[in-house]
UniProtKB/Swiss-Prot annotation:
The serine protease inhibitor PSPI-21 comprises two protein species with pI 5.2 and 6.3, denoted as PSPI-21-5.2 and PSPI-21-6.3. They may be encoded by two alleles at the same gene locus. Gene3D superfamilies: 2.80.10.50. This is Serine protease inhibitor 1. It holds the Pfam family Kunitz_legume. InterPro entries: Kunitz_inhibitor_STI-like_sf, Prot_inh_Kunz-lg. CDD domains: beta-trefoil_STI_CPI-like (cd23372). The lineage of its organism: Eukaryota, Viridiplantae, Streptophyta, Embryophyta, Tracheophyta.
Amino acid sequence: MKCLFLVCLCLVPIVVFSSTFTSQNPINLPSDATPVLDVTGKELDSRLSYRIISTFWGALGGDVYLGKSPNSDAPCANGVFRYNSDVGPSGTPVRFIGSSSHFGQGIFENELLNIQFAISTSKLCVSYTIWKVGDYDASLGTMLLETGGTIGQADSSWFKIVKSSQLGYNLLYCPVTSTMSCPFSSDDQFCLKVGVVHQNGKRRLALVKDNPLDISFKQVQ
């Protein structure tokens, strides 16, 4: 059964509305909103595609990619994996769709967002590009990341990018019920960390209690 979480409550009605609301300047981002940066120090742009890469090298490295889930009856590749090393294929490009996208093209730390594999695909597989968290996998004791999500869906498709305590960034899974309630909340008590588990010899992204995946972002040229 999929885990259920309480909705995040804000102390103000809508934190994305600035106290300086005027007819000339109706909406501002929170003053403490910090842009997410790529490996070159540039701010992420929702119009561009990126590869999610590891902050480490060798056997500790490896890009994130779209692959076929073991024992899945889905008609398209629907698993979110990480290569076993940074030596080898490049990862599958993604784009980030922020819940505050009406403010511009920037992507910010602690912002609720969707993640989509930015690839050409058939009509049949279009719905298998949006990330989500799947049902509980009893054999692995956790919930695995997969595709088949929905942009704006409040249950299984919301993530956050947060600064890592080590290097780069971490991903959090944050199933809140409304993007307008807390789109920039830094209270992550309702979020779970995204890390890696081993599934049939592959590294599969999944929800973890410890050792979250440390990642960076490299723009696809």
